[in-house]
């Protein structure tokens, strides 16, 4: 299912177990790309709203997990990929997640199904295009939230989950450092972002008063 979050600019691709997002602010950005089986689905969702993979100008990766980077290879994109360290290195295969915690061990095991990008992943720091890039470590060490204030939209990956307008923390077993993730939630909320939409990797995006929903979660995890 494809859902319009901001008319003419932001779309959610519900890929079943995970979401990806397409943003058009004059440049076309794909945020995350599902599993290795998601590529055809993403291509179909793009076609529904008048796009094709060749239209994508950049890919932003909120974090390195199979269900967020797996579909990129199958899209045959001619676009740079951006991620924060160390997740960028984990995706391109120049470094591996630590096997000393459950999250890293799981990433190493399922990493055999990840097709590495042909070109080096570009490192994102503070911003890219119309997006501010905020470090939100916890779920993974290099987790990043991408915020487009002009479109009043925050794309937060697995920092949170969503259910019927409310936000929750991600499942503890699949989060590298739950305490640090909670701290990242508080830090992002403290920025008092001027956003309506909070769009996450798993669950239903918040489409009204997203900043308030994030602040409410920050109080609950405080």
Question: What do these predicted ranges mean?
Answer:
Residues 82-95, 150-155:
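Short, solvent-exposed beta-strand-terminating loops
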Residues 1-11, 39, 59-60, 96-104, ...:
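Haloarchaeal acidic low-complexity proteome signature biased toward cell-envelope/secretome components but also
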Residues 29-31, 60, 81, 153-155, ...:
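Residue-level marker for buried hydrophobic side chains located in beta-strands
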Residues 2-48, 145-162:
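Conserved beta-strand hairpin/beta-sheet module of binuclear metal-dependent hydrolase folds
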Residues 25-27, 75-80, 129-132, 149-152, ...:
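Short glycine/proline-enriched coil/turn segments at helix->beta-strand junctions
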Residues 39-83:
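Active-site metal-binding motif and surrounding structural segment of the metallo-beta-lactamase
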Residues 36-37, 87-135, 141-216:
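Metallo-beta-lactamase
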């Amino acid at each position: 299912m494809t859902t319009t979050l901001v008319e003419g600019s932001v779309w959610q691709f519900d890929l079943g177990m995970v979401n990806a997002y397409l943003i058009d602010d004059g440049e076309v950005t794909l945020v995350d790309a599902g599993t290795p089986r998601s590529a055809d689905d993403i291509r179909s969702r793009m076609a529904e709203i008048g796009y094709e993979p060749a239209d994508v100008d950049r890919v932003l990766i909120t974090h390195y997990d199979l269900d967020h980077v797996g579909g990129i290879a199958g899209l045959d994109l001619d676009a740079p990929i951006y991620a924060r360290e160390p997740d960028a290195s984990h995706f391109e295969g120049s470094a591996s997640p630590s096997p000393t915690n459950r999250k890293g061990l799981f990433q190493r095991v399922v990493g055999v199904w990840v097709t590495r990008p042909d070109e080096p992943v570009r490192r994102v720091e503070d911003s890219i295009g119309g997006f501010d890039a905020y470090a939100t470590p916890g779920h993974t060490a290099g987790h990043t939230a991408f915020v487009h204030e002009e479109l009043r939209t925050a794309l937060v990956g697995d920092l949170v989950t969503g259910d019927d307008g409310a936000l929750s923390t991600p499942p503890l077993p699949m989060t590298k450092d739950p305490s640090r993730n909670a701290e990242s939630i508080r830090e992002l909320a403290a920025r008092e972002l001027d956003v309506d939409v909070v769009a996450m990797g798993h669950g239903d995006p918040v489409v009204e008063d997203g900043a308030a929903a994030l602040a409410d979660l920050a109080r609950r995890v405080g």
